[in-house]
Amino acid sequence: MSDTEENVLDSPASGEAAGEVISIPGPTDEAEESDISPEQEYEIEGFTTESEETVEHYSDLSVSTPKSYDSKPRDEVVSLGSATDSHEQEYRLGDLGGDQRSEEDEMSFLYKIKAIKENLQSSVKECIATVKIVLIPAGQEIVMPFRVDAPFRFLKEHFAHLLRIPHHVLQMAYTGISVGNNESLIQYGVKPREIVQMNVFSSEPDQYPVRRIEGLSEGSKIITVTIQTGIERYEEVAVEIVKSDFHKPFLGGFRHKITGLEYHNAGTQTVPKKIPEKDNLFCRDTQTVFQKKKLQQTMNTTSTQMTKIGVYVSNMTDKLLTPGSYFSAAEYHARRLNAVIVIQTAYRRWHAKCYVDSLRLQKKMRLEWEKEEELKKIREKEEWIRMDYYRRHNPKTTEDFELLFNALELWRQEEVTQVEQYSSEAERKAALCELLEKETQIIASIGRHRYVAQLERQDVATQAFLDKCSASNTWRRPDGQTVEMDTQFTIRARELQSIYKCILLKNLSQDERLDILLTLKHTVKEHECKLTQEILELIDREVDLMMRGVKSHNLEGLRKRITTLFIHYIKTPLFNPEVAKHLKVPQDPLKFYDKIYFCHSCQMYLPSVEFSVSPTSHRVYRCRHCINLENETQRRESFLKYKCLLQRLYFSEANYEDNSHIAYLMQLQDIKYLTENIWASQSALSAWDDLNDLVMVRWNKHVEWSPWNCILLTKDEGTAHLKLESIEKGYGRLFIHKIKHKHILAKNYFSQVPVLASLILKDDEIEAIRSKYSTENPPKIIVPHGIVPN
């Protein structure tokens, strides 16, 4: 809508139109009555009655107010602005002394009333703000004018009526803060003629959800427009702008001769009203039926019109029909049968063509899928080779060094095989000595890499340990949020961590290094013991050497000793109480007795986490370090592939979500025994022996995984196996017998595990097999010489 079209709108009409779109009873009636006290209400009522009597008494003077004011109710004019006490006194004095004044005084009194009314209305008009209401979560926006001093409860009741929601459930928020029923916009600092946004939502969204208001025109917008109603007189009118795509017809208008602006009639500016559809109307004769029971014959069959004297019948439209060949009913049905055959032939041809096209499309999609799968496998293989190459050249973890020693053993076996082909004994010995020297050099190189990796892991472990000690104490509240608290111990640990990080900094100037050493000295000086004395002596020695001009690279050993001693200082609970929670060795020896085991290989007492216990083992014998050392010196096996196989088993069982727990009891040695000794490290179907492509899936997918309910297959074979509805229909009898035999071997081996033994004993099949091959006589016990049996 243009400005010219807006100025043409008449103020009363536009005000009524806006009131029809959004009718809020509060700001015009109830809101103002609630703001007026009972005493003021009594005074205003007296004022209105007295003013009405005065106007009726002097009606012959024909004094009239402008149309815009007369169109409004009198009580609205009085209630929009709260009159001051001085004005009310003038009204009372004017009414009491009206009979004694002259006619000129009475006219001046009416003019004063008129001026006061204009001031009151102008003040009320200026206190309106534009409010944009956003319905959450519907996302509908409604723009409307609202008084800044009116309470929010009228706005809430209005939208509660539109949304059909109880007003006590509906909530309103301004700038993220819920507003009260008796609060207003002016209390939140909103000034007149400002544009604000408020959110409307439901406190019980499940029972009373907020939906879109269907009755409002889409794209409609209500704005406040100031129009001129007289000389130096303006009025604000709420105007609704309707965005419509209909063609506005030109229904006439006029053009301003001076400005040249065109003003169209109101019919071209508003959406035409839809004409209601009328129901189908029928005459009375069409709704009644007259029944006749006698037979009648039409008149056309009783007479024939022909040419005769006095009558001429034209034969221009007549046709000469010649009789065709006669065909019998059998010929007619045969012709229809031939037509049906032709139609069926065409349909079958079309249907076969569609079927072939669908098969061709399926074949194309299948070939594309197979191609993508092949590319995926190639990428996975390349990624595995790339990671294997990276592991060999940059070993970091224990698995990486196992892989290196395994490759070394394979290389040594190949070289030994070639050496054994030599004819003479001297050549074989010389070749074996040369091979031993090369092997020694490779082992030394691996040892250097391991030393570097240990230093890196030690630094990372130290930083992680300090971060854990200096972390704040956290709790999770019932609402999901986290509460953090710092104690004096965590603050102390954080201070020591910051000093440790400063000590590790390099490329510092001499003054900066002296400041760090001074801070460290003041921190350590708080406690007196042998450790702190050593740290202080080393600090003094470094300061002395720095003053003598010794270069930094010559002080690296001294600085490393200071760092190591300071780490011992940090890990002492006397100096850092927070560290006592994270030490492997607890301060109370009584808590440590049940978790200490003796290693028969290295003759050391170690905590339980340093031992790897298999489910089939009955006692703790050797620690992890001794087992790894034996593997490096003798077998040199790599367990990385078995670890990946075990990880794939864990992930596949987690997807079932049936609370299976036997798979998670399997250790690395168990899965290795199950793969090598029972399944021969190859697929049961295709005999594929690459462990990177094999998975251990359930034999019966409806029963949880166990060593006696599994099968070793490739990834593709495992996916196809799990899609089988019945194992008996999918495999042959001999293959099923072979798999069950392997399951019996697994049961015999894992029956040593107490947890698994209880599950195995419940199996009727294994009991039947054991009873079939059991013997009544006990086995013979062979007693060595020198031992007396009990």
UniProtKB/Swiss-Prot annotation:
It comes from the Eukaryota. GO terms for biological process: cilium assembly; flagellated sperm motility; mating; smoothened signaling pathway. GO terms for cellular component: 9+2 motile cilium; acrosomal vesicle; motile cilium; radial spoke; sperm flagellum. Residues 336-365 form the IQ domain. InterPro entries: IQUB, Ubiquitin-like_domsf. Keywords: Cell projection, Cilium, Cilium biogenesis/degradation, Cytoplasm, Cytoskeleton, Flagellum. Its main location: cytoplasm. Residues 129-205 form the Ubiquitin-like domain. The keyword 4Fe-4S does not apply. Residues 85-100 have a biased composition (Basic and acidic residues). Residues 29-44 have a biased composition (Acidic residues). Residues 1-100 are annotated as: Disordered. It is found in: Cytoplasm, Cytoskeleton, Flagellum axoneme; Cell projection, Cilium. Adapter protein that anchors the radial spoke 1 (RS1) complex to the A microtubule of outer doublet microtubules in axonemes. The triple radial spokes (RS1, RS2 and RS3) are required to modulate beating of the sperm flagellum. May play a role in inhibiting signaling via MAPK1/ERK2 and MAPK3/ERK1. Additionally, may play a role in the functioning of cilia. Not required for the functioning of tracheal or ependymal cilia. Component of the axonemal radial spoke 1 (RS1) complex, at least composed of spoke head proteins RSPH1, RSPH3, RSPH9 and the cilia-specific component RSPH4A or sperm-specific component RSPH6A, spoke stalk proteins RSPH14, DNAJB13, DYDC1, ROPN1L and NME5, and the anchor protein IQUB. Does not appear to be part of radial spoke complexes 2 or 3 (RS2 or RS3). Interacts with CALM1. Interacts with DNAJB13. Interacts with DYNLL2. Interacts with NME5. Interacts with RSPH3. Interacts with RSPH9. Interacts with ZMYND10. This is IQ motif and ubiquitin-like domain-containing protein. It comes from Rattus norvegicus.
